[in-house]
């Protein structure tokens, strides 16, 4: 179906082993090509929601569909194949610090190989060319042979974005991608995500602390408080009072 959501969460609840409720009856549809930002207090459930989408956190109840197929019920090889469609960008960059930028970015292709091959990082010339082109796209080609630990935080995050581009997913989940960066670098990182969204029609879902960045880059905003969605609307139709309510109307709880 042409109007089938890229991501759909149906009555999703997440309860941790200690009894903490991370998500409470979440119902959400995100269409292909949207740039969605999720806002809320620290501990409101933003990261839990994002990580549930690709099953970094398994949910307790409900179902999550990726392009109409349940990721919740998928196992083994089929789960690995489904995760190819989903790229993840973390606050902590998740790079191999002692490896070169090229090798880190080439790792975006690992999902396309059997486990034995990924163990030895056996990348083809085509993989390396894809990686170089991805680095060009984010303005980092001159660092191709540098070690990851020689880069600034902003440069490392842009390398992480290039790695996702090399994967060629349909969905990008960005978990606080600018949290540890200065304002100028944060904007550069968001511009890179915007480029992936517009040039490659990738669906982007990003958790953001910065309301300014959320307003500038998001097509749609979702407000989360205490594990529940308390607002969902177009950014252009969202007044400041909505953000005030999301941040001042309730208290977050601790996440993993």
Curated annotation (Swiss-Prot):
The keyword Nucleotide-binding applies. Transmembrane segments: none annotated. Part of the ABC transporter complex PhnCDE involved in phosphonates import. Responsible for energy coupling to the transport system. This is Phosphonates import ATP-binding protein PhnC. One of its GO terms (cellular component) is plasma membrane. It catalyses: phosphonate(out) + ATP + H2O = phosphonate(in) + ADP + phosphate + H(+). PANTHER family: AMINO ACID IMPORT ATP-BINDING PROTEIN, PHOSPHONATES IMPORT ATP-BINDING PROTEIN PHNC. Its EC number is 7.3.2.2. CDD domains: ABC_PhnC_transporter (cd03256). ATP binds at residues 40-47. Residues 7-251 form the ABC transporter domain. GO terms for molecular function: ABC-type phosphonate transporter activity; ATP binding; ATP hydrolysis activity. Its main location: membrane. Keywords: ATP-binding, Cell membrane, Membrane, Nucleotide-binding, Phosphonate transport, Translocase, Transport. It is a peripheral membrane protein. The keyword Membrane applies. It is found in: Cell membrane. Belongs to the ABC transporter superfamily. Phosphonates importer (TC 3.A.1.9.1) family.
């Amino acid at each position: 179906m042409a109007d089938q959501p890229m991501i759909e969460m149906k009555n999703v609840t997440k309860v941790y082993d200690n009894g903490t409720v991370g998500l409470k009856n979440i119902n959400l549809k995100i269409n292909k090509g949207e740039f969605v930002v999720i806002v809320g207090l620290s501990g409101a459930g933003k990261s839990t929601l994002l990580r549930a989408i690709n099953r970094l956190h398994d949910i307790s109840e409900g179902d999550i569909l990726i392009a109409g197929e349940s990721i919740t019920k998928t196992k083994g090889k089929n789960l690995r194949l489904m995760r190819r469609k989903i790229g993840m960008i973390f606050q902590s960059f998740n790079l191999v610090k002692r490896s070169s930028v090229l090798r880190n970015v080439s790792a975006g292709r690992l999902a396309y190989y059997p486990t034995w091959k990924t163990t030895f990082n056996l990348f083809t010339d085509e993989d390396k060319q894809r990686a170089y082109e991805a680095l060009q796209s984010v303005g980092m080609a001159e660092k191709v042979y540098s070690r990851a630990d020689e880069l600034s935080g902003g440069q490392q995050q842009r390398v992480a974005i290039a790695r996702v581009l090399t994967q060629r997913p349909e969905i990008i989940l960005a978990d606080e991608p600018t949290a540890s960066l200065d304002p100028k670098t944060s904007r550069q990182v968001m511009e890179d995500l915007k480029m992936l969204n517009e040039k490659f029609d990738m669906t982007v879902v990003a958790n953001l602390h910065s309301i300014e960045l959320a307003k500038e880059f998001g097509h749609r905003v979702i407000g989360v408080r205490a594990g529940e969605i308390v607002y969902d609307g177009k950014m252009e139709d969202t007044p400041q009072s909505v953000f005030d309510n999301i941040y001042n109307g309730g208290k977050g709880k601790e996440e993993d």
